[in-house]
């Protein structure tokens, strides 16, 4: 006796003998028949698709003999084979010890009354009805319509009433005795809400819903203090352990590799042979190795083509004052170049102190800027000397250290330059006189 192989929905119609109740220690209970959900559709090789005495006759013909039944379950929507031994010696009434009624599967699934809110101290609460998980599926009388249940409650006012109740949480049926009482102190005779219709039917479940996996011992068989079979191994909690930064593989999932900003995202994830791949430790648990993040690429600077190209000139490094730029030997600052630069260049030279400490010398061919730093002051002796005329000396700022040195240098060289100009003028005068005499 027991359960057999499950199959799809039965052929030959959607009717059968519906089990309303199964008594304790009866042949039906020993065979594993489930009240309300099971329909007997075949006995032996006879399909029970009509309401007649075929089931009763075949049970009497096989008293104390095993007989095979095909049973359709509305909860799993499957057909299974059951072996039962009809008997008169089990101590109860009937050969099976179960009450049956011929009806269709669809109609039986609709005859469900869902227990909703249960008020405290109400007749429903005293009877042990559980809100939202209990379903009334039958009683001592046949219930065929939605109003039949409410009529049954009214007819049993102040009298005990037996109800067959299914609980979706425990996946089992039980018998509940309730005594309707309209004077209990609240609304209704039961003190609970009742739902009926499509939204209040018992949800279907897969065939393996209430079956435990093989090899799992019952809770009582586990030793004291032992973790359950599906418990996680001991280790750091997700809050205490750092997140994995590698593209490691474990069973059937892949963890993405974190990329630094600007790095290529087309790099393949590390394979099983890479250092970051998870490898099992001696205990059989995966071990993850962390890979540090790659630094971001250097920042690229783009020069504007409109600026001066100083690629051929070594500029001063503030961190190293011993290196000083060497100007090309062909570059010379003359009095003529400075005098022809105009007042704008002189103004920019005099206002260099106000622009962050830059001193700028402007000429007709180039323009060089020097930063105001200790290294620049230490190499002031190597700067080219400028000679300015008397009319331009007043424009220099005495507060600028470089301008003061230039003014002193100009004061020392001014007599020599003046004598040179006078000598040149006399020479030109003699040449012109010689030319005039020759012409005459």
From Swiss-Prot:
The modification Phosphothreonine is found at residue 216. Residues 327-336 have a biased composition (Low complexity). The keyword Phosphoprotein applies. Residues 190-202 are annotated as: Essential for interaction with GOLGA2/GM130. The keyword Phosphoprotein applies. Phosphorylated by CDC2/B1 and PLK kinases during mitosis. Phosphorylation cycle correlates with the cisternal stacking cycle. Phosphorylation of the homodimer prevents the association of dimers into higher-order oligomers, leading to cisternal unstacking. GO terms for cellular component: cis-Golgi network; endoplasmic reticulum-Golgi intermediate compartment membrane; Golgi apparatus; Golgi membrane. One of its GO terms (biological process) is negative regulation of dendrite morphogenesis. Residues 15-215 are annotated as: GRASP. A lipid is attached at residue 2 (N-myristoyl glycine). Residues 205-248, 261-301, 327-440 are annotated as: Disordered. It is found in: Golgi apparatus, cis-Golgi network membrane; Endoplasmic reticulum-Golgi intermediate compartment membrane. This is Golgi reassembly-stacking protein 1. It comes from Homo sapiens (Human).
């Amino acid at each position: 006796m027991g359960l057999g192989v499950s199959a799809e929905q039965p052929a030959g119609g959607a009717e059968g003998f519906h089990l309303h109740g199964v008594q304790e220690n009866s042949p039906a209970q020993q065979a594993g028949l489930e009240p309300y959900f099971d329909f007997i559709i075949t006995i032996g090789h006879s399909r029970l698709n009509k309401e007649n005495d075929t089931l009763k006759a075949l049970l009497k013909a096989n008293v104390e003999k095993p007989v095979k039944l095909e049973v359709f379950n509305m909860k799993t929507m499957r057909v299974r084979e059951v072996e039962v031994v009809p008997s008169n010696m089990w101590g109860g009434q009937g050969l099976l010890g179960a009450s049956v009624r011929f009806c269709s599967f669809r109609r039986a699934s609709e005859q469900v009354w869902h227990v909703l809110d249960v008020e405290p101290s109400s007749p429903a609460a005293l009877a042990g009805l559980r809100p939202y998980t209990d379903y009334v599926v039958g009683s001592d009388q046949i219930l065929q319509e939605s109003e039949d249940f409410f009529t049954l409650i009214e007819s049993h006012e102040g009298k005990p009433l037996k109800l067959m109740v299914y609980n979706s949480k425990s996946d089992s049926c039980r018998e509940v005795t309730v005594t309707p009482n309209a004077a209990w102190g609240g609304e209704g005779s039961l003190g609970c809400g009742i739902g009926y219709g499509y939204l209040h039917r018992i949800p279907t479940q897969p065939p393996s819903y209430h079956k435990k996996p093989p090899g799992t011992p019952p809770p009582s068989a586990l030793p004291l203090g032992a973790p359950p079979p599906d418990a996680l191994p001991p280790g750091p909690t997700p809050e205490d352990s750092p997140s994995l930064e590698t593209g490691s593989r474990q069973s059937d999932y892949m963890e993405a590799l974190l990329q630094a900003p600007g790095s290529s995202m087309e790099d393949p994830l590390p394979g099983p042979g890479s250092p970051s791949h998870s490898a099992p430790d001696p205990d059989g648990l995966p071990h993850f190795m962390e890979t540090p993040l790659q630094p971001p690429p250097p920042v690229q600077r783009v020069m504007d083509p409109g600026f001066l190209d100083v690629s051929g000139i070594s500029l001063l490094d503030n961190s190293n004052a011993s290196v000083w730029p060497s100007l090309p030997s062909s570059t010379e600052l003359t009095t003529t170049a400075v005098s022809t630069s105009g007042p704008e260049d002189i103004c920019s030279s005099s206002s260099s102190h106000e622009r962050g400490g830059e001193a700028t010398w402007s000429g007709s061919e180039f323009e060089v800027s020097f930063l105001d730093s200790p290294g620049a002051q230490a190499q002031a002796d190597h700067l080219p000397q400028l000679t300015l005329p008397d009319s331009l000396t007043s424009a220099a700022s005495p507060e600028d250290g470089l301008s003061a040195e230039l003014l002193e240098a100009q004061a020392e060289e001014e007599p020599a330059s003046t004598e040179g100009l006078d000598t040149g003028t006399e020479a030109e005068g003699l040449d012109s006189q010689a030319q005039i005499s020759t012409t005459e």
